């Protein structure tokens, strides 16, 4: 197996044992990108010169036995809505084409402190609005398992690059499923941490009460290792939580005998296809075989998650994206003759169709006369959804179900049908609305397209999610299939 498919844990071991130099790892990754990414189209920008320079500096530290950092010499890819100082950050939008940040995001500072090596920026749905990575202004990423299928979204580039062996880990952002859904479609592991667990400073805002940064990897333990490096309270983000326990790996490998797991009947109901239901039922049998107690429960407000989410997220987006006016930064229309025209033309030309749709929806929901009927009512529904989870977690440790109602759909199949596209978020949006942690791991395949299993945990209990996900992974994984993609 090529180095490109090795895990974060294995690469770290090889580097620390001096079996390989960081520069050799990074070169192998760029060779893989050159060979594979013209087809996959996961990267928007590469930072090869700086990456090789840093890797060679790490070679020198390796020679001196000064290998500090949990991710020493490990290559990484970063979703293009996470600010990277000195490297173009576009959010896959014409609006930010050519924008080079002059400061660093908190997560990037943390990863640099761990001596990880930035390979490049990854494709996404424009401003993280979409579920297929087809709304990107620049290119359409494909699914490494089936090039006629979407990789999911909005972190489609982040998921595809990891599945294709182009980076051992990546970061994405999850507002309504944007890490977990592409992880499910691409057969990898994706974690949306508890809201506030990871600083959002330097994440270009979509919906500020929902957005969270998280890792995507090819196995569960790697995911826990990466998450440990990026969590923590941040003075630059007032919503970051002062939680002391940032250890996610110590329970990995412990059995799950006696663990109580809830399976909501709504998660296997209308809209979920038969192959997905069968894969989840098989997964439940595996969990029971490991000694877990799985029981059916009800989360009665699940069906209201999508309408509630799209009102709240679009309302927050209409506010957050008002800063892109063509004056201070962002696309500047050359056709405008007046200030009013400058605002209108810069935004209408700079934003894509889906972004404009959500800005319009959010502006309408917040407008006088409709605020109570839409936005306020959606916030009440959000409270009911959170209370549903609270009731279940009084008696259960974890909730399990499918990540998505179906496997990956075909490229071009749903891009012009927004309601069908939004329906794919049925099982992921409630987790964001409740601010809970959720992880997606592979649990099956149909017609070569992976199916994802989602575990949902109590607030700030990512450790338990990793424990149960790891135990399941030992019985079912796609590790040997990645190299055949």
Swiss-Prot record:
Keyword annotations from UniProtKB, A to Z: ATP-binding, Ligase, Nucleotide-binding, Protein biosynthesis
Secretion signal span: none
Residues at the active site: 79, 154, 178
Any one of the GO BP annotations: translation
Reported function: Allows the formation of correctly charged Gln-tRNA(Gln) through the transamidation of misacylated Glu-tRNA(Gln) in organisms which lack glutaminyl-tRNA synthetase. The reaction takes place in the presence of glutamine and ATP through an activated gamma-phospho-Glu-tRNA(Gln).
PANTHER family: GLUTAMYL-TRNA(GLN) AMIDOTRANSFERASE SUBUNIT A, TRANSAMIDASE
Subunit text: Heterotrimer of A, B and C subunits.
This protein's name: Glutamyl-tRNA(Gln) amidotransferase subunit A
